[in-house]
Design a protein with these regions (language model features):
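Residue-level hotspots at or immediately adjacent to binding/recognition sites across diverse folds
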Residues: 19-383
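C-terminal motif of bacterial Sec signal peptides marking the signal peptidase cleavage site
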Residues: 14-17
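N-terminal export and membrane-targeting signals
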Residues: 1-11
Length: 383
């Protein structure tokens, strides 16, 4: 009998020692850093009263900008933009529309170059209700002047979307997509944009159908980020495009995963370029240094989209499309959680933007009925 008890005890010990690693205690969750978020107010622009609706924010060379529209009681819109030197005290810019559609523009994207603003706006109209797109640029007197374009430049039969705008050493770049594939619009000064589409690298081809999500200026020219859906497959691949002049583009597919991946936002951080998007079932970064791309770290398990990405405090701040937590990284590899001042709401009617300069970040959250802004100087990462 004693021998049976001993054998049984030995079996218990052996089984205890063979527990699978998955039964081990989970690693402790990092405590989010809590920056000193301060609410920011925007003055209502002159004109009929209405609700502010904001869509984008940007900063460079000591200037901050926010763009959107004013929605009146009847649902009418008019373009609106603001400027600040410290992300706290703001001044409404005077819009100067040059077309009937411009008078009703919703400014959807903002870019900055040498402390000057350029923006993309639109208003649905015409027989088919297609968006009529305009660009806007800062004038010497501080106003924001519409630059009307021929309908086919941004619209026409091949139109799909006109996305984000970025300033760089060679001027301005707008990223978007056409029925032919990816597209870019370039301008040296913002006075007139030229459409570049249906060219090698950007056009859909035997490799698959591309989609561009964002762009950034680099010391050597321009860079676009997005994805490629290979022919016969359902999972996308992360893709970057590079160009010296904005007219000839070279496409490169980056490492992804079996579950699919894409690039949604991109920024320059010092001498590096960092893109963020979805990798499988979470968000992740891809990092370029010295012309070579590599996979960076992952963060935000369960998240599939990032609403904003900005260079802040020598690193980058990413704001997912939904939830109470942002993420900060110094190098794109190790990410730490950052408590946001409010949970980012989900849904198609909401809009979120983030901009950064030095140690300061500006967060814009529009839930479709109310606009809120905050600025903070950090801290952003663990001590």
């Amino acid at each position: 009998m004693r021998r049976g008890v001993a054998v049984f005890g030995l079996l218990v010990l052996l089984l205890a020692g063979c527990r699978p690693a998955s039964r081990a205690a989970p690693a402790p969750t990092a405590v989010p850093v809590r920056p000193g978020w301060q609410p920011v107010s925007l003055p209502v622009p002159p004109g009929a009263p209405g609700r502010l609706a904001l869509r984008d924010a940007t900063a460079c060379a000591g200037r901050w900008f926010v763009v959107g529209t004013v929605v009146d009681a009847a649902g009418g819109t008019r373009p609106a933009a603001w400027s600040s030197s410290d992300a706290i005290t703001w001044t409404a810019l005077r819009p100067v529309p040059r077309s009937p559609y411009g008078e009703e523009n919703l400014l959807t994207a903002a870019g900055c170059r040498d402390g000057r603003l350029a923006a993309v706006g639109g208003k649905s109209g015409g027989v088919h209700g297609n968006p009529r797109i305009s660009t806007w640029r800062a004038a010497e007197d501080g106003s924001l002047v519409e630059v009307p374009a021929e309908f086919e430049v941004f619209g026409g039969a091949d139109a799909v979307n006109v996305g984000r705008i970025a300033g760089g050493p060679r001027g301005w770049l707008i990223s978007g997509n056409r029925a032919t594939g990816a597209a870019a619009w370039v301008s040296p000064d913002g006075a007139e944009f030229a459409l570049v589409s249906a060219v090698p690298g950007l056009a859909a081809d035997g490799a698959g159908r591309p989609w561009v999500a964002d762009g950034v200026g680099t010391p050597s020219g321009w860079l676009l980020v997005g994805s490629m859906l290979p022919v016969g497959r359902t999972a996308g691949q992360p893709v970057v495009w590079t160009s010296a002049d904005g007219r000839s583009w070279r496409r490169a597919v980056l490492p992804g995963v079996d579950g699919g991946a894409d690039l949604q936002r991109v920024v320059r951080v010092g001498e590096r370029t960092v893109a963020v998007g979805r990798r499988g079932d979470r968000l992740a970064a891809w990092v370029e240094e010295g012309g070579r791309w590599r996979s960076g770290g992952g963060f935000g398990a369960g998240a599939r989209a990032v609403s904003g990405l900005a260079a802040v405090a020598g690193g980058l701040l990413a704001v997912p499309a939904e939830g109470p937590t942002g993420w900060w990284s110094r190098d794109g590899d190790a990410w730490s959680p950052v408590a946001l001042p409010v949970a980012v709401p989900g849904g198609a009617e909401r809009s979120v933007a983030v901009a950064g300069s030095g140690d300061v970040a500006l967060l814009v959250v529009d839930d479709g009925s109310q606009v809120r802004l905050w600025s903070a100087r950090g801290p952003w990462g663990p001590a």
